Amino acid sequence: MTSLDQLNHFLESNPDLEILELLVPDMNGIIRGKRLDVSEAKSLFSKGINFPAATHLLDSSGNVIDGIVLGTDDGDPDVTAKPVDNSLSPIPWLDKPAAQVMITMFDENAEPYANESRNILRNVIKKFEAEDLRATVAVELEFYLIQDKDALSINPRHGPVPGTILQDEGPQVYSMEDLRELDPFFNQLKETCKAQNIPMGTTISEFSRGQFETNLHHVDDPLLAADHAILLRRAVRETAKSFDMGATFMAKPFMETAGSGMHIHISLKNETGDLMFELDTNQGSGFNQNVEHAVGGLAQTMEEGMAIFCPNANSYRRFQPGFFAPITPNWGPNHRNLSIRIPLSDPKNVRIEHRAAGADANPYLVMACVLAGIHQGLVNKVNPPKMISEGEVIDPEITLPVKWDKSLDAFESGSILKQYLGSDYSDLFLRSRRCEMDRFNAQISNKDFEWYLRSI
């Protein structure tokens, strides 16, 4: 079915449609876009639409990065944008009948636009296809709900003590009461995800008040899995607004509570459909060499990947003791204090869980780096670090760059990930992050006044 056929079929089922929103995830994983009248939809689906190429290169505040091509210095040129196949879906939260579609860009030679993070991931996937390997992946995302409009500060949602105006205390991890109180919200979110083809799975109350985790069902297409993650974040935020709440995927929105992560679960099959990751009692780790080499590659590339996994200033506030945040590239089975975990599973479903990224990261770039690490490990037979046993008590030394400037230095000096992401895109990413870091550090916050104004 062509893109135009998909549109016509959708319009037949939704004859009252008035609005079409075009979604463009930028370098930060922030959705930018345009809104069209439905009368313009057929032109979009048949010919495409002009779109500024620099949209993909904005910083987190929507600023154009100084001194790069495809920005203000060269007139902000357009490229052609076209719909992503099978991404057209209804929007239930707007007042008028509306739909959304993801779009992807093409350069003047009709080639996929090189600075689009979806295409960066697509290029890494091609390396697996060249080895006749297929990845099955799923994404878990943690987030906070916010609900206290009368407060002078931003606070996570607290569950009430039933029958009183008092607020419940403690993290209440796995609380069924929290889920019960938010039943209308989660029911609406589930319906929205179903309508938008987002395979939402299990939801739990997480390790802090107002924090929740939702997982996505696994799919055999890493690009589609990243699409699902991007769209889930949008669905959560928009559904929360409908219930007079806010939602945030910031990595560390509150100082004394847990940070929010993005966990990537991945398994591999070869050209005959056989599982690549298996148990092996002949190996000291209990896992076969494919698992060990994949873990070895992930550990080897984690230091230079931290700039991708933790892309902004707030990302690095997540690295505090006691909150399951990664500080060294360790690994082992069934252990949440590790950066690379082998979850408990039956022998036919062995998978690797990558736990380094924050919930604020760009899913396409995170997925690209995770796949790159696994590919690097398998192709070069990289040995993993010493395995941490299940239940082992650890006090790891911080070896990963858990400061923003240090992570950017590690990415710049790294030699592996740039080969997968492309040197040009890597340079643009670095310039974007350094420019945003400089702008952030130049701000005068209230904390400056609270700490220094009176005493200095």
What are these regions (language model features)?
Residues 1-202, 224-228, 396-456:
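ATP/Mg2+-dependent ligation/transfer catalytic cores
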Residues 2-4, 238, 245-246, 269-326, ...:
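Catalytic-core signal marking the mid-to-C-terminal active-site face
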Residues 26-28, 106-112, 178, 218-225, ...:
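A generic structural motif
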Residues 90-97, 135-136, 203-208, 257, ...:
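Short glycine/proline-enriched loop/turn "hinge" motifs that connect secondary-structure elements
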Residues 101-107, 212-219, 266, 354:
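Short, hydrophobic beta-strand segments
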Residues 136-144, 161-176, 196-215, 247-264, ...:
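Core alpha/beta catalytic barrel or barrel-like domain that forms the active/cofactor pocket
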Residues 173, 177-200, 214-221, 233-249, ...:
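Accessory "access/gating" subregions that flank catalytic or transport cores
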Residues 211, 216, 222-295:
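Acidic, glycine-rich loop-and-beta core segments that form the ion-binding/anion-interacting portion
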